Amino acid sequence: MDRLDEIVGIRGQKAIEIVGRAAVKEIGAGTKGIKADVSNLQELDSLYAAIKAEYSAIDILVANAGFDILAPLGAITEEQYDSIFDTNLKGVIFTVQKALPLMKSGSAVVLIGSTASIQPGSMMSVYGATKAGLRNLARSWIEDIRGSGVRINVVSPGPVRTQSLYDFFPDDKRDEILAFLETKSTVGRLGQPEDIAKAVAFLASDDAGYINGVELVVDGGASQV
């Protein structure tokens, strides 16, 4: 593929301005940010209408939206549950379903899961449940669209050095927790965003043309030992 235009769906106009500038700098002028909350089906419709009008088709879809709210059993609220499930599971279901009419044979879908689907930490039960759900969506969906030529796979990262990971921990405990997480990795370090991007790029590429319905765990082996 000689040229790749990238559309980034982003929740919130201010985030579009910030992420959009960074994406254009890193990826190039073919990048565009469009406001879209994946839990809002009308905003998804607007997103895909804009893509159809300008590009007519989607070759690669990466369903990356997701977040967590830490809460132990006994303190989980309905509001927390609904917000996590609306984004992490409902959002993914309709992100993919509404994209399918724009995808042709040879296209690829990559769902971003998490090793929390198999090893959720304390206070991560709701988040872990949504990520386990993604794994089973992929298993079922490849049967639903059998013969379409569209592949669906999952990339499940472990801890990755991003701002969202740093913000997840209290300031006075952050370095200690990150050091502990690093010891869990059998390659001696935490993941970098580039590690996940390379895994996604592989599963979306023609090199993975005979790979369908798998979960590729990218965590330095931490969940395997």
What kind of feature is each model-predicted range?
Residues A36-S46, E78, E194-D195:
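The beta1-alpha1 cofactor-binding region of Rossmann-like NAD(H)/NADP(H)-dependent oxidoreductases
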Residues V96, T130, A138:
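Active-site helix of classical SDR
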Residues P101-L102, E143-G147, G209:
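Alpha-helical segment proximal to the catalytic Tyr-Lys
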Residues Q119, A201, N212-V225:
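Short C-terminal tail/terminal secondary-structure segment
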